[in-house]
Amino acid sequence: MWDSSYMQQVSEGLMTGKVPIDQVFGANPLEKLYKRRKPKGTVGLQCSPCLMSKATSTDDIIWDQLIVKKTLADLLIPINRQISDIQSTLSEVTTRVHEIERQLHEITPVLKMGRTLEAISKGMSEMLAKYDHLVISTGRTTAPAAAFDAYLNEHGVPPPQPAIFKDLGVAQQACSKGTMVKNATTDAADKMSKVLELSEETFSKPNLSAKDLALLLFTHLPGNNTPFHILAQVLSKIAYKSGKSGAFLDAFHQILSEGENAQAALTRLSRTFDAFLGVVPPVIRVKNFQTVPRPCQKSLRAVPPNPTIDKGWVCVYSSEQGETRALKI
């Protein structure tokens, strides 16, 4: 039987901690419970061997991937370098291609010129071949003119083959008296006589037409339809009518060589050249003075009693209303 007072003392001792539990029970009844519990934060979680093997294989895969990435990066570096070299080479090739295209555009006129020269060479070859045939077909080369004249006197027409002295024979036949000459032969003789009259003097100072002479003077004048253009036309026409167009052009060039401009040369010639002294300026019919070239309208003056070109009066404009104005330089 348990003593109640003893049990009360034991209870109080246990409650107050004065009596150890081992002393009462001989062993701690919660010892097994303490052993089964795991202290917090002192020992890590323990994985099973299966999980540990799986973790190890994952680490290997990640490591392999890192190795593969590094290998690919090492391979891509030279590839990028080669691509950059290829791009630079392509840019250089493109530049050279554009340069070649530009040179081809420059060579194109040369090629066309080459074709033209080839055609000229071919034409010259044909002309040389015809010339060789020309000498052979005229009979004896020592007297081709006599042979031509004999054939012409006998038949009345030139021989069908080409002849070296054809022009000379035609001229002699046309100039001979008492001979019936056909129209074609007469025309050829007239043309030949004009050519035979060409001498050193006429060649150096040709009698130019008024239009050609005015165009030559225009090349030295600035602007268009100025009073000096009208003066050049008037002087050219007067010089052509007097047969001194060549001398007038020589005098014009002589003044230019002295350092004067074209306007000063025309003004000086209009006052000193003998063909223009005392010549009355021509009269030009116009509808009204508004049709006169605009650069000349400011130079229109009232017509004096006796206008002459050597006094600076170029021409006289006459309108349909009967009014007159003179162009003064």
Swiss-Prot record:
Domain of life: Viruses
Domain VP35 IID: 204-329
Subcellular location field: Virion; Host cytoplasm
Regions annotated as coiled coil: 70-120
Record flagged with keyword Protein biosynthesis: no
Subunit structure: Homooligomer. Homomultimerization via the coiled coil domain is a prerequisite for binding to L. Found in a trimeric complex in which VP35 bridges L and the nucleoprotein. Interacts with NP. Disrupts innate immune signaling in infected host cell.
Function: Plays an essential role in viral RNA synthesis and also a role in suppressing innate immune signaling.
Family per record: Belongs to the filoviridae polymerase cofactor VP35 family.
Protein name per UniProt: Polymerase cofactor VP35
